[in-house]
């Protein structure tokens, strides 16, 4: 996906015949159309940041390593783990399905700023594909919250006898802090996409004000796209650490074990 739009970025206007063979509706004459270019950037950013780096690092390794390194038989709630997995699976299916709907997938960039995301008819990717993006992200957030709560409860309640908080491996500390950051920040993004859905479907104007299309003013007033930016980046800034901390925790254990030297100061 990233290779396709980077080819067009590196060689603007250049025709690549294999693109026409691979995706004839997206790249007529071997040149990726502008709206499909934006759609690929949006999908790539969303999948990499949320579905791979967030769920892949935190979700996968937390479930594997937290019980193993704490001496617990399993996670605190197997039922919550199951719900988290199936919400994530459903979210992934909906995100992939958005590629095949009329108008194509969401095309507002992975940050989905209004007004492109708030007006269903703004651009081809603002239609059903954008709606599916919002639904997919809402389910992903529910999955992330269920998993994070499970990790926190497991760390606090299921440590083996004699393992105090100060004796936990740094990997577990990284997963714990990541889970706390997720519980504090993901609900804000959930509220942001919920209000965005209201703007799209129910005629509200949380993010819309003084919008003109083809010289005609829309009947929306009182909102501001900046509100969405504030809500989105309330998650966006902690998201950096949600992505980074699990990798740092794992690296600290791998380096300390293979160098046969304890972590300095811990």
What are these regions (language model features)?
Residues 1-266:
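Membrane-embedded and interfacial regions of multi-pass energy-transducing membrane proteins
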């Amino acid at each position: 996906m990233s290779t396709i739009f980077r080819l067009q970025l590196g060689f603007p206007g250049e025709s690549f015949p294999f693109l026409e063979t691979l995706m004839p509706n997206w790249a007529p004459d071997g040149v990726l159309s502008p709206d499909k270019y934006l759609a690929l950037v949006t999908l790539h950013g969303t999948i990499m940041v949320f579905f791979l780096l967030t769920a892949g690092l935190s979700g996968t390794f937390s479930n594997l390593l937290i019980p193993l390194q704490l001496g617990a038989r399993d996670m605190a709630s197997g039922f919550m783990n199951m719900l988290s997995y199936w919400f994530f699976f459903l979210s992934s299916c909906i995100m992939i399905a958005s590629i095949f709907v009329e108008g194509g997938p969401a095309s507002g960039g992975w940050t989905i700023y209004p007004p492109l995301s708030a007006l269903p008819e703004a651009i081809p990717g603002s239609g059903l594909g954008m709606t599916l993006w919002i639904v997919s992200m809402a389910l992903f957030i529910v999955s992330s919250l269920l998993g994070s709560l499970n990790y926190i409860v497991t760390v606090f309640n299921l440590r083996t006898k004699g393992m105090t908080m100060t004796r936990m491996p740094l990997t577990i500390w990284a997963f714990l802090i990541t889970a706390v950051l997720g519980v504090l920040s993901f609900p804000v993004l959930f509220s942001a996409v919920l209000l965005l859905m209201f703007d799209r479907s129910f005629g509200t104007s949380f993010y819309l004000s003084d919008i003109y299309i083809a010289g005609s003013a829309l009947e929306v007033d009182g909102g501001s796209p900046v509100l969405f930016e504030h809500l989105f980046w309330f998650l966006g800034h902690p998201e950096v650490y949600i992505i980074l901390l699990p990798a740092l925790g794992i690296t600290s254990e791998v380096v300390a074990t293979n160098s046969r030297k304890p972590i300095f100061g811990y």
